[in-house]
Every structure is written in structure tokens, then in C-alpha cells.
Amino acid sequence: MAKTPENIAIDQLDKDQIKTFSDFLMSYNKLSETCFTDCIRDFTTRDVKDSEEKCSLNCMEKYLKMNQRVSQRFQEFQVIAHENALAMAQKTGKL
């Protein structure tokens, strides 16, 4: 049975959502591993020490701020690249 354009669009949307969620999980796992490795040192007790908790929170905050800043810069460069491509297309008469 042939797929309709609507079904193809839904399949692509599902793939995009799965990719987005997969990227989120990879980022979350990287954050968890990095902060755990950097901050947790004492395995002789079940309790999390205040210093470990503070370090983990600082690590998480720094990572999230860095991720936000990289995303902002990426968006800025995308806008510039789009404007440059548009200007080039206008200059060459392809628009």
C-alpha cells in the first residue's frame, strides 16, 4: 500500500521528534557524567556532602549557560549566513 503525503509527513515528524529527544538525552547524559566525575569524590557514605551538592549545582548551571550561549551564537550565525546567501542571490540575479 502506497503512503499518502500526509503519512510521509507524519513519519518525518516522528523521526524529527525522536532525533530531538535523542539529542536531549545525549546532552543530559553528558552533563550528568561530567558533573558526577568532577564533583563526587566520597563513596563511603550514602549521603551527598554539601560540597558535592554545591559543586554539582554549579557544574550544571555552568553547563546550561554554556549550552544556551552556544545556541544563541549558532542562531546569530545562521541569520548572518541566510542574509549573505540572500544578498548573493540578489547580486547574481537568481532571486
Swiss-Prot record:
It is found in: Mitochondrion inner membrane. A motif (Twin CX3C motif) lies at residues 35-59. GO terms for biological process: protein insertion into mitochondrial inner membrane. It holds the Pfam family zf-Tim10_DDP. One of its GO terms (molecular function) is unfolded protein binding. InterPro entries: Mito_inner_translocase_sub (IPR050673), Tim10-like (IPR004217), Tim10-like_dom_sf (IPR035427). Disulfide bonds join C35-C59, C39-C55. One of its GO terms (cellular component) is TIM22 mitochondrial import inner membrane insertion complex. Keywords: Chaperone, Disulfide bond, Membrane, Metal-binding, Mitochondrion, Mitochondrion inner membrane, Protein transport, Translocation, Transport, Zinc. It is a peripheral membrane protein. Mitochondrial intermembrane chaperone that participates in the import and insertion of multi-pass transmembrane proteins into the mitochondrial inner membrane. May also be required for the transfer of beta-barrel precursors from the TOM complex to the sorting and assembly machinery (SAM complex) of the outer membrane. Acts as a chaperone-like protein that protects the hydrophobic precursors from aggregation and guide them through the mitochondrial intermembrane space. Heterohexamer; composed of 3 copies of Tim9 and 3 copies of Tim10, named soluble 70 kDa complex. The complex associates with the Tim22 component of the TIM22 complex. Interacts with multi-pass transmembrane proteins in transit. The twin CX3C motif contains 4 conserved Cys residues that form 2 disulfide bonds in the mitochondrial intermembrane space. However, during the transit of Tim9 from cytoplasm into mitochondrion, the Cys residues probably coordinate zinc, thereby preventing folding and allowing its transfer across mitochondrial outer membrane. Belongs to the small Tim family. This is Mitochondrial import inner membrane translocase subunit Tim9.
